[in-house]
């Protein structure tokens, strides 16, 4: 894309308009000076669209949405980008829909659940000349950019890292698609992929992937990267929140400790989707090659045999029955 392209008002469609993350995409489309012309969701609780693009056409059935997008293309008003906020297991099919309609794709994580699906998508990219970009907002977080630069300047140094992310979810979670491993990829994929992607980006490619716990509500293991040994713990169980966090009535705890130093990145997320869109529109978004190692890592976690709980493991594992 040339610099002049960035000044053109791009036409977007959005799949998954009723989802939690969709408003961030609507805001990013608006704040980058572009237009949402069509949206899809089987659920019709989408009044949020009025806050951003009240003139956008809305559909609850994919077939009618498909017909509309095709009609726009044939009449010379084709969609330039399709933003995908649908359930994880549908991303692959919705990306293919986008590419077949000659549109670039902006996709929430995970791009796909299985790494081999990336191969087919790259083939379709080559056939259509359209690109697939994934939102990897942690790569744009100032504190994590600073950490990445610090690690790069340090040369061959190795790091000990503890990553903990507990985001409590209610009973609804297990009854939704998120509680179905075949649809969400499980806890490590659904709430952890953005962290694994960031860790790989900062500390280099994975060398070993050890899984100690892989339950419906939590997962834990050790990920050995080129320049770090990462003990990680992910959970949607409120009982796994630190006591101090529970006393405050909070439902989320996020921590990353690098060589004994806490890296604070809990704040600063407000405009990272908009920053991601700016990069994508400038042609510098994160493509399929850049998401591959993260997708491979969580796929390995999903299918791994559990390692014995001996030696080095995340401290929070001690509170689990498996220890």
Enumerate the predicted regions with their spans:
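C-terminal helix-rich "cap/oligomerization" subdomain common to oxidoreductases
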Residues: 1-7, 71-73, 81-83, 278-323
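Beta-loop-alpha module in the N-terminal Rossmann-like domain of NAD(P)-dependent dehydrogenases
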Residues: 25, 57-123
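NAD(P)-dinucleotide binding in Rossmann-like oxidoreductases
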Residues: 211-302
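A contiguous active-site-proximal alpha/beta segment in oxidoreductase catalytic domains
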Residues: 89, 112-171
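Rossmann-like dinucleotide-binding domain that binds NAD(P)(H)
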Residues: 171-241, 292-296, 320
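N-terminal Rossmann-like dinucleotide-binding module
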Residues: 1-55
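Local beta-strand N-terminus motif with an aromatic residue
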Residues: 36, 55, 78-82, 155-158
């Amino acid at each position: 894309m040339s610099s002049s392209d960035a000044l053109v008002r791009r036409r977007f469609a959005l799949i998954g308009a009723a989802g939690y993350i969709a408003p961030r995409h609507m805001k990013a489309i608006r704040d980058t000076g572009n237009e949402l012309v069509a949206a899809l969701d089987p659920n019709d609780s989408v009044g949020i669209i009025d806050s951003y693009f009240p003139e956008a056409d809305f559909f609850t059935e994919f077939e009618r949405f498909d017909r509309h997008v095709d009609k726009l293309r044939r009449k010379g008003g084709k969609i330039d980008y399709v933003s995908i906020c649908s359930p994880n297991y549908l991303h692959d099919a919705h990306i293919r829909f986008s590419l077949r309609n000659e549109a670039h794709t902006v996709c929430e994580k995970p791009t796909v659940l299985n790494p081999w699906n990336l191969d087919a998508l790259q083939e379709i990219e080559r056939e259509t000349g359209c690109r697939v970009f994934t939102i990897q907002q942690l790569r744009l977080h100032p504190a994590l950019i600073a950490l990445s630069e610090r690690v790069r300047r340090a040369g061959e140094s190795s790091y000990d890292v503890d990553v903990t992310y507990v985001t409590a979810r209610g009973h609804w979670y297990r009854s939704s698609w998120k509680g179905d491993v075949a649809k969400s990829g499980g806890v490590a994929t659904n709430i952890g992929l953005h962290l694994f992607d960031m860790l790989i980006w900062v500390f280099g490619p994975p060398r070993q992937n050890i899984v100690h716990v892989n339950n419906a509500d939590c997962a834990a293991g050790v990920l050995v990267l080129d320049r770090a040994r990462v003990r990680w713990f992910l959970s949607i169980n409120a009982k796994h929140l630190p006591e101090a966090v529970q006393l405050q009535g909070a439902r989320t705890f996020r921590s990353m400790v690098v060589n004994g130093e806490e890296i604070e990145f809990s704040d600063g997320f407000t405009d990272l989707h908009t920053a991601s869109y700016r990069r994508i529109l400038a042609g510098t978004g994160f493509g399929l090659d850049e998401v591959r190692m993260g997708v491979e890592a969580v796929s390995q976690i999903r299918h791994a045999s559990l390692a014995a709980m001996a030696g080095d493991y995340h401290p929070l594992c001690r509170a689990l029955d498996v220890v």
